């Protein structure tokens, strides 16, 4: 007796019966095949339970379709029996598809399983997407705000370096300790025209004599030096500054992309446009330019390497760090700003030329580095006591009004952290600050909305000064620094407990006020220190760099300082300067855009190009004669007559006529001994003997014409970054293959005809001849 068929086999039999009743032979053959399948199922019953529904469907499909090996065996043994048993399955279902639409059972199961699998994959994909969105919900700007851009960038670098294949594909990464070089930056060489050297012993002694300092054997003073090409670039930069055209800076970067003064000037241009991201990108590039010039002996971590601010070559680096620290404060990265301010202070702590200490009294508390401020204050206070009788113009932080108040607040914060309810040390420090610098009290009270007694408000020592018209330089500096500290640091005192502590301390200290407050030793030492010009200029320069935020404090700067000769690239040079951008500094320097002697190959190439531009030989000779007859005019076009012809075809006729007319009248735009095409006032600006600053140019008629085909595109691609001075000769094949479009010569012909007469132009075979009127006989024989 055959075994009982399973449910699947029974379902197949029911489907076959519903098709219309097969013949008896088909029934017999189907029974035989069912028996064969049953035997196979019994043989593999142990593993049949492990099969999935999809695998069962495949097995059933294979059973219903003829196999090649089985078909050959069936042909030998049974003949046509196997095809008869398979006929109802293969041929009948398509014919009866209208009456029984549910015939393909197994493909339907497969579709259902496929749909379920796709649904599961879609759900898993949604889960992964939700996870990714949850991870990215914290904006990178917030991460930078809380942790600083340095930490976020370091995290990115770590994750990027985890994949070995991607790191191997990176070409060469620019390294820097001060910035994060971007992939969009130009290619950089080793030094980029800058080098650094140690000051000689005689130079160091001269500096100590100028500053009235004692020699410190442990310190080492350095200065940056310019190469010949970098100095030529700086001279062209000064000429562009005097022209007042910001577009000229892009032409300079085409010659030397890594020029710090140009980068800082472009940064100011973008800052005035309120494009702060692009502005700080140029500041980063300027820092990177100087950092590459520092050799291994000049390190920031030793604390003994100094950069001489009296040399103009070093001053762009000071300015770049100051602007970087200021922008970091604007972005809320106070800890990074604190580190940059410390770096700025360490370059020249005895002069502090950019007033880094005026940043640090605020940033130390804001960044949670109050202990550092206390340590520095105590160190210089001890030095002040040991050298009490020595006259020294070195800057001392313990004598500054902002540091005295910041020290009292730092002690108060530490006492609150240690749960010290007595506050003896902080109150004593605050009383000392109030008695030494009472000018801060009314300013800070107004910012904190603290009411002061009338006896204090009306006292002469608590008077609020708004300018320096009736004050001595040292007293004016005291009120200037008082305003500066309150305007920057009043937010640190906004806490209710700090306001109450400040109000109660002031009221209790001055419960009975005499007509004149006794002066303290700290107050007298401050006035003595700021009687020297170097500390005064440090405070003035600090305000001038931060012009946008502290414009109203300019009233404390003397008039002769504001009227002094200075530029945005070098704000307020020090009175003890050794070098500055003047005629002596640029002596023997070649003009970067001057007309140089062209080689034979270049002259031959120019002739071929000019033939393509101006096919008329007679007119071409006339144009060459005019160009060679006016060397001052030719100096405006470093590319030679070809560049002049190209520009002439692009300029309007009236502009070109004015240029040539000015040259034909004697070249009034050029000054004796000046650079070709330089701005009026440039020579006076470079002259050290000039007292008053020359006004910038109102027009640009005498400006040098510089043809630059690609500006930002070439710079971003690194074009010109590695160009050397000796790579100026082009290959002959390139000159021959270069396509030059003919230019319309009618404009030049008309202009030259006005200067040299209309009958001097030779006969021309071009079609333009018919458009011109017949020549006129000037002799009157018509």
From Swiss-Prot:
InterPro entries, per the entry: TCF25/Rqc1 (IPR006994)
Record-level GO cellular component terms: nucleus; RQC complex
Annotated pathway: Secondary metabolite biosynthesis; terpenoid biosynthesis
This protein's UniProt keywords: Nucleus, Transcription, Transcription regulation
Pfam families recorded: Tcf25
Tree of life domain: Eukaryota
Region (Disordered): 1-37, 49-128, 156-180, 717-745, 758-782
Biased composition (Acidic residues): 723-740
Location relative to the cell: Nucleus
A GO BP entry: ribosome-associated ubiquitin-dependent protein catabolic process
Bias type Low complexity, positions: 157-166
Basic residues: bias regions: 70-79
Function: Probable transcription factor; part of the gene cluster that mediates the biosynthesis of clavilactone A, a meroterpenoid that features a unique benzo-fused ten-membered carbocyclic ring unit with an alpha,beta-epoxy-gamma-lactone moiety, forming an intriguing 10/5/3 tricyclic nested skeleton.
Protein name per its UniProtKB record: Probable transcription factor claV
């Amino acid at each position: 007796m055959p075994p009982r068929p399973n449910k699947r086999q029974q379902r197949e039999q029911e489907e076959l019966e519903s098709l219309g009743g097969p013949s008896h032979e088909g029934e017999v053959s189907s029974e035989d095949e069912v028996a064969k399948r049953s035997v196979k199922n019994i043989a593999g019953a142990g593993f049949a339970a492990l099969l999935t529904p999809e695998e069962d469907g495949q097995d059933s499909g294979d059973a219903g379709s003829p196999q090649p090996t089985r078909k050959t065996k069936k042909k030998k043994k049974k003949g046509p029996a196997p095809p008869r048993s398979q006929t109802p399955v293969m041929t009948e279902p398509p014919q009866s598809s209208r009456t029984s639409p549910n015939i393909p059972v197994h493909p339907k199961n497969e579709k259902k399983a496929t749909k379920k699998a796709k649904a599961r994959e879609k759900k898993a994909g949604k889960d992964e997407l939700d996870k990714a969105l949850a991870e990215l919900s914290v904006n990178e700007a917030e991460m930078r705000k809380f942790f600083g851009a340095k930490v976020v960038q370091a995290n990115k670098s770590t994750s990027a370096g985890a994949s070995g294949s991607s790191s191997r594909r990176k070409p060469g990464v620019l390294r820097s300790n001060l910035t994060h070089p971007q992939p969009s930056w130009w290619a950089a060489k080793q030094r980029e025209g800058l080098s650094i050297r140690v000051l000689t012993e005689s130079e160091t002694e001269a500096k100590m004599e100028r500053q009235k300092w004692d020699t410190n054997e442990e310190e080492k003073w350095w200065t940056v030096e310019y190469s010949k090409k970098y100095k030529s670039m700086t001279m062209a930069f000064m000429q562009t500054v005097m022209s007042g055209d910001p577009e000229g800076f892009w032409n300079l970067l085409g010659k030397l992309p890594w020029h710090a003064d140009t980068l800082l000037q472009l940064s100011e241009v973008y800052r005035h446009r309120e494009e702060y991201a692009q502005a700080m990108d140029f500041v980063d590039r300027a820092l990177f330019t100087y950092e590459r010039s520092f050799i291994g002996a000049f390190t920031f971590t030793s604390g003994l390497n100094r950069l001489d601010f009296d040399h103009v070559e070093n001053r762009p680096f000071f300015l770049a760090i100051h602007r970087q620290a200021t922008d970091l404060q604007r972005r809320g990265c106070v800890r990074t700003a604190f580190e940059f301010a410390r770096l700025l202070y360490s370059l020249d702590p005895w002069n502090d030329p950019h007033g880094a200490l005026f940043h640090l009294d605020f940033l130390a508390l804001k960044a949670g580095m109050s202990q550092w401020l206390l340590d520095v204050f105590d160190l210089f206070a001890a030095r002040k006591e040991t050298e009490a009788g020595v006259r020294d113009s070195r800057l001392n932080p313990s004598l500054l009004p902002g540091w005295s108040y910041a020290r009292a607040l730092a002690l108060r914060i530490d006492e609150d952290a240690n749960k010290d309810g007595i506050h003896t040390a902080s109150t004593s420090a605050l009383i000392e600050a109030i008695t030494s610098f009472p000018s801060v009290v009314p300013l800070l009270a107004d910012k904190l909305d603290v009411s002061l007694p009338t006896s204090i408000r009306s006292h002469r020592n608590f008077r609020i000064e708004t300018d320096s018209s009736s004050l001595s330089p040292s007293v004016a500096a005291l009120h200037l620094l008082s305003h500066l500290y309150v305007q920057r640091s009043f937010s640190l005192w906004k806490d209710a407990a700090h306001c109450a502590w400040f109000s109660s301390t002031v009221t209790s200290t001055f419960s009975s006020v005499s007509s004149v407050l006794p002066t303290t030793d700290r107050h007298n030492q401050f006035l003595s220190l700021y009687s020297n010009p170097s500390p005064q200029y440090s405070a003035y320069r600090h305000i001038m760099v931060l012009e946008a935020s502290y414009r109203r404090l300019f009233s404390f700067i003397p008039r002769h300082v504001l009227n002094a000769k200075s530029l945005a690239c070098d704000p307020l040079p020090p009175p003890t300067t050794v070098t500055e951008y003047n005629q002596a500094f640029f002596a023997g320097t070649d003009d970067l855009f001057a007309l140089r002697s062209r080689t034979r190959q270049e002259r031959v190439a120019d002739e071929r190009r000019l033939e393509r531009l101006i096919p008329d030989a007679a007119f071409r000779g006339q144009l060459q004669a005019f160009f060679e007859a006016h060397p001052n005019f030719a100096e405006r076009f470093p590319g030679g007559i070809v560049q002049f012809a190209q520009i002439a075809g692009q300029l309007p006729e009236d502009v070109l006529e004015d240029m040539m007319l000015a040259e034909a009248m004697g070249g009034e735009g050029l000054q004796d001994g000046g650079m070709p095409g330089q701005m009026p006032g440039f020579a006076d600006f470079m002259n050290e003997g000039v007292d008053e600053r020359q006004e910038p140019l109102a027009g640009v008629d005498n400006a040098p014409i510089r043809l630059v085909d690609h500006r930002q595109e070439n710079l971003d691609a690194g074009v010109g970054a590695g160009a050397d001075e000796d790579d100026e000769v082009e290959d002959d094949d390139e000159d021959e293959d270069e396509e030059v479009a003919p230019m319309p010569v009618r404009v030049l012909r008309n202009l030259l005809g006005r200067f040299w007469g209309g009958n001097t132009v030779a006969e021309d075979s071009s079609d333009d001849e018919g458009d011109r009127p017949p020549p006129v006989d000037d002799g009157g024989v018509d």
